[in-house]
């Protein structure tokens, strides 16, 4: 059978209807999720993805790029399969878009063995059930809501509380500490942040463009002729972007494109030994939002708060693929924008059901000047269990939560009557809780250029020791500011002694 050619019959925003001529007997319409190609007048190609079969000869598709300039009657060519992503060592250190084209201005990528972005989750017998902790070097996370290898972690927070900075620090720490490989999917976020992330990664050595390029970048140039491709393949991250300015089709699919890249690296572990892959999605809310934008145009009835009726299905299909197999693990960290700080909104609420750990960022904590602004009482982890993390770790974490909870309860009394009305025992609790609260902060490597303070990665043993000393009252004599933005307890003691000396002068 010769290849059938379609023609555009209707364009409504990002949704394109394609009509295929032919009799019923010889006409085989492209399958759902197949990619079709439209050649624009300027020679560039536009990929559209089949979403529905409507009528007898028409398919309804969603465009992966702007539909500006399309006209009725333009030819449409089926590609014979779904959108695919390139795989292998060649994609290390590279930037790609939703359809797997390179967007970093460097050489084109080879499509041999490319993976389809619509894949089935691993079979049950291929899964692994071993529980292991992934230590990040960030005190508040490692102590109170430890991440599990192969788990799903949600970063919840409103606008501007530090989700992206925390993700950048995690990428930096995992690359340095675990020699792990990271895949970053930028889903509907700011293009500027993507640019900053790439520069940050080149500076920290997570992505390598070679010394010659790095020197020219530091002088303010961006000269791709100086890129050393042998160095690029030693990079420890790949970036996939579908940013805010992209149409909703691209934003809804780019999370799947990034996940496909992460799966390809995990599956390479079958040859090279088990691999730990970190998969970052910034922001999973935009995945839902893009789905709701397209949903109405596809003629679906909206459900609660205007979201698509298939919200739970789309989310489940993606989340089920993020898992550990015998060839390696994919640990995913998903930033979740919370609309109007409302955790009961269907988008964050649907995401919650899939998560193993939640890190909730709070505006109240940013107002205290404590960064990362993680809310220790709202954040949770399924693996904070003495059988997994050890008895001492578990006990210290519970004591930290108890003292912070008691402090929260006493705040109402303090705000009305003042500290003087508290009993001596309660006053001691408040003073220690304030030290604990400040010690949960720490300087970040990726924020060093803004703060001027070198970043700290703290081992879990040092974290447990530090909080135990505060809870046991061994450092009650030190002023509260000593505990703010330090790594280990030794740094806090040194800082506290300097503050005491200055106060006594």
Swiss-Prot record:
Family: Belongs to the ATPase alpha/beta chains family.
Task of the protein: Produces ATP from ADP in the presence of a proton gradient across the membrane. The catalytic sites are hosted primarily by the beta subunits.
EC number, UniProt record: 7.1.2.2
Record's subunit section: F-type ATPases have 2 components, CF(1) - the catalytic core - and CF(0) - the membrane proton channel. CF(1) has five subunits: alpha(3), beta(3), gamma(1), delta(1), epsilon(1). CF(0) has three main subunits: a(1), b(2) and c(9-12). The alpha and beta chains form an alternating ring which encloses part of the gamma chain. CF(1) is attached to CF(0) by a central stalk formed by the gamma and epsilon chains, while a peripheral stalk is formed by the delta and b chains.
Gene: atpD
Family annotation (PROSITE patterns): ATPASE_ALPHA_BETA
GO cellular component, one term: plasma membrane
Keyword Membrane included in the entry's annotation: yes
Pfam assignment, any one: ATP-synt_ab_N
Cross-referenced InterPro entries: AAA+_ATPase, ATP-synt_VA_C, ATP_synth_F1_bsu, ATPase_a/bsu_AS, ATPase_alpha/beta_chains, ATPase_F1/V1/A1_a/bsu_N, ATPase_F1/V1/A1_a/bsu_N_sf, ATPase_F1/V1/A1_a/bsu_nucl-bd
Catalysis performed (reactions): ATP + H2O + 4 H(+)(in) = ADP + phosphate + 5 H(+)(out)
A molecular function (GO) term: ATP hydrolysis activity
Residues the entry annotates as binding ATP: 157-164
Keyword Ribonucleoprotein carried by entry: no
Signal peptide, first to last residue: none
Organism the protein comes from: Bacteroides fragilis (strain YCH46)
Location in the cell: Cell inner membrane
Membrane topology, record value: Peripheral membrane protein
Stored CDD domains: ATP-synt_F1_beta_C (cd18110), ATP-synt_F1_beta_N (cd18115), F1-ATPase_beta_CD (cd01133)
Coiled coil residues, start to end: none
Primary enzyme class: translocase
Protein name: ATP synthase subunit beta
Gene3D superfamilies assigned to the protein according to its UniProt record, in alphabetical order: 2.40.10.170, Bovine Mitochondrial F1-atpase, Atp Synthase Beta Chain, Chain D, domain 3, P-loop containing nucleotide triphosphate hydrolases
The entry's keywords: ATP synthesis, ATP-binding, Cell inner membrane, Cell membrane, CF(1), Hydrogen ion transport, Ion transport, Membrane, Nucleotide-binding, Translocase, Transport
UniProt-listed NCBIfam families: atpD (TIGR01039)
